[in-house]
């Protein structure tokens, strides 16, 4: 069982952008991740059977990075060295992005432009924006 110190997830309060409404599944995933981090994972009383029957002890996540709009961000991560890996991974999501060359090219252009737009104000070629939470 992996007990992460750092969790990266969607910001469930990030409901829409200037030209889109964010997918409800992404918001729900962010809410679920945050609920699992606190109080579920760190509270013995939430699932006592996991301690008693499985020997799984409570765990405290130390840091959370919420993927968010730039206006809500407190941290910008330089992804310049890994942007091509990100693009390649997202191109594999064929049911969502298509498989024809034109669609994949538009996806790559859009992803790189968005990362550039996020990074440029911070002197970063390509970046992602996060709301950082340090848990006590």
Question: What do these predicted regions represent?
Answer:
Residues 1-136:
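Metal-dependent de-N-acetylase/amidase catalytic core
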């Amino acid at each position: 069982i992996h007990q992460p110190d750092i969790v990266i997830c969607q910001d469930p309060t990030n409901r829409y952008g200037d030209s889109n409404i964010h997918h409800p599944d992404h918001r729900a995933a962010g809410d679920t991740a945050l609920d699992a981090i606190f109080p579920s994972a760190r509270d013995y009383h939430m699932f006592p059977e996991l301690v008693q029957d499985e020997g799984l002890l409570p765990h405290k996540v130390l840091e959370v990075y919420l993927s968010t709009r730039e206006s809500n961000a407190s941290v910008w991560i330089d992804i310049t060295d890994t942007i091509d890996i990100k693009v390649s991974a997202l191109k594999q999501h064929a049911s969502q992005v298509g498989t024809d060359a034109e669609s994949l090219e538009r996806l790559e252009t859009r992803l790189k432009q968005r990362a550039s737009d996020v990074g440029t104000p911070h002197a970063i070629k390509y970046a992602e924006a996060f709301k950082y939470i340090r848990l006590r």
